[in-house]
């Protein structure tokens, strides 16, 4: 019994450490991003318009970025095989065995992305509704809507994050549904070809953030948080600290920074595999 427990600990120790690290990073990204949009002064006006839905949508987006960065790594089979046979051959068997089980990390990241993507989408639908309902000319610069007449559906489908998000959600559903074991057993080609839609998904993800949806205040020194109650009044006449109206700037897209490294690795891996596939094979000996 003692030997079995010790063997189980030895065999699963590194796997448990990796899983705990993955979970810790996800929790950190979710909580830190949520609190940033909830408490930060530079996002105060955005929070006034959208409330908790902007916190939830941005928190999920950050965790999705992290899982997007990880999901391609197990797919680099040639590079992983080289690492296992060349770099880890002198190490204990646990690291090499862990490399062989990276498929589990790929599946874990995929299902996590599905859950987070649904929450992210629903939160952005609420954001669009609140952009429409809370439109005011007093802080028009913070709003994606240009007038009260723009409907929620129009705000979703007319903006880059909206229509790319819809397409990405459909692609993700196709990729995941065709990945189940029942589909792979009946028609592996369907699984194989639909899985290549991941590249389209990643390309869309790179452009998903170029819609200038989330904005932060840039002049907190001349318009601190306390000035928000004076948005309908003349700034200079009502307060000595509110020297001017709030000004805003759009966030810089971040998703492509998470994806570009793993995507380049995957492209290199596929090029190596393609080169090996077309390379002539010579028979050295026949017995």
Identify the role of each PLM range.
Residues 1-287:
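FNR-like FAD-binding dehydrogenase module
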């Amino acid at each position: 019994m003692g030997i079995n427990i010790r063997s189980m600990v030895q065999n699963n120790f590194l796997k448990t450490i990796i899983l705990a690290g993955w979970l810790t990073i996800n929790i950190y990204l979710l909580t830190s991003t949520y609190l940033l949009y909830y408490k930060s002064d530079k996002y105060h006006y955005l929070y006034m318009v959208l409330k908790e839905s902007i916190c939830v949508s941005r928190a999920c987006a950050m965790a999705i970025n992290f899982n997007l960065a990880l999901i391609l790594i197990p797919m680099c089979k040639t590079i992983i095989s080289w690492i296992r046979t060349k770099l880890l051959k002198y190490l204990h068997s646990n690291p090499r065995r862990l490399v062989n089980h990276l498929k589990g990390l790929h599946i874990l990241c995929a299902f996590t992305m599905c859950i987070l993507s649904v929450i992210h989408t629903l939160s952005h639908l609420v954001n669009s509704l609140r952009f429409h309902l809370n439109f005011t000319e007093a802080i028009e610069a913070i709003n994606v809507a240009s007038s009260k007449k723009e409907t929620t559906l129009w705000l979703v489908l007319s903006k880059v994050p909206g229509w790319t998000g819809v397409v990405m959600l459909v692609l993700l559903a196709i990729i995941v549904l065709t990945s189940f074991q029942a589909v792979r057993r009946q028609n592996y080609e369907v699984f194989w070809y639909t899985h290549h839609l991941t590249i389209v998904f990643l390309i869309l993800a790179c452009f998903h953030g170029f819609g200038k949806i989330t904005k932060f205040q840039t002049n907190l020194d001349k318009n601190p948080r306390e000035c928000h109650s004076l948005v309908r009044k003349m700034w200079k006449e009502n307060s000595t600290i509110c020297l001017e109206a709030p000004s805003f700037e759009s966030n810089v897209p971040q998703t492509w920074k998470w994806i570009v490294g793993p995507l380049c690795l995957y492209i290199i891996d596929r090029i190596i595999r393609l080169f090996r596939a077309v390379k002539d094979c010579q028979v050295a000996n026949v017995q």
